[in-house]
């Protein structure tokens, strides 16, 4: 993990088995992850939003991965949530079909959690929609995901991470099966 420790020493990673009984409140701007007792999640959201509307979408579990439906252009996608991902990832086969919805298409080098560098394609997705929340100019890498999809029943079209989760406070509720984007 030394390649992950460029500014902060990391002693380990938390996984689904650690926080599966909790709801997670991500506040990337504040640099906090709050574990919420699921019985207080709605009250916490109401307190944080002051009654302003939120975007709430259902999640479906695929093993240990929470998944949401998303839309890019006319293309409906099934995306896993990876709160540790520095960027978003879509399967390589979407590179050509999503061409009209992308800007800044190029090849780049990506270093994965295994510290191995790979040449990949990257671009910014002009508009990605989850529920009624629209995200613009989302930096995205296109690459093979067969190693992950091989172990999943339905498979994924990609993963969302920091670019989506960091734009606002976000709650991931495993117990109630929903992803909540706060205003």
PLM segments and residue spans:
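Pepsin/retropepsin-fold aspartyl endopeptidases
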Residues: 1-183
